[in-house]
Amino acid sequence: MCKSYTHNSQLTTHTMSFTESTMLPLGSEAPPFALPDTIFGNTIRLQDIASDKATVVMFICNHCPYVLHVNEELVRLANDYIARGIAFVAISSNDVVNYPQDGPGKMKEHAVKVKYPFPYLYDESQNVAKAFDAACTPDFYIFDKDLKLAYRGRLDDSKPSNGIP
């Protein structure tokens, strides 16, 4: 079970794990953001990376067993779809006091190690996670060409304990 990194009083059950989360309604406009990229050090804004086809925003972290379980498939899918013009960006909003392995330096090390083909951004204030109603990792948001939410949820049915890759 992944730890929650946001709090909201309006909760609904999230099917990916035992963590409850709110759900950004389908059709919602993507919340704008400008966050530091832990790999290259520059600031990334949503409007600068958004694709005219689709944009995938992922809330992940280094320590979550669910993220670790899907990392290989995530990299494979991202490489495949980036080649087709789909934009990908990952964001970590974890509290580094409680999870020091999720700090910016460790994020960069992890991104290089697993060969993330997308920016890995650090949301220190957790304001971006709150704007997206993200509550656990991994959490995936797919926005259409107009940055309207088309999908929110899990990558697939796999999890560390079910034997599905």
Predicted regions: what is each one?
Residues 2, 16-165:
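Chalcogenol-based redox active-site neighborhoods
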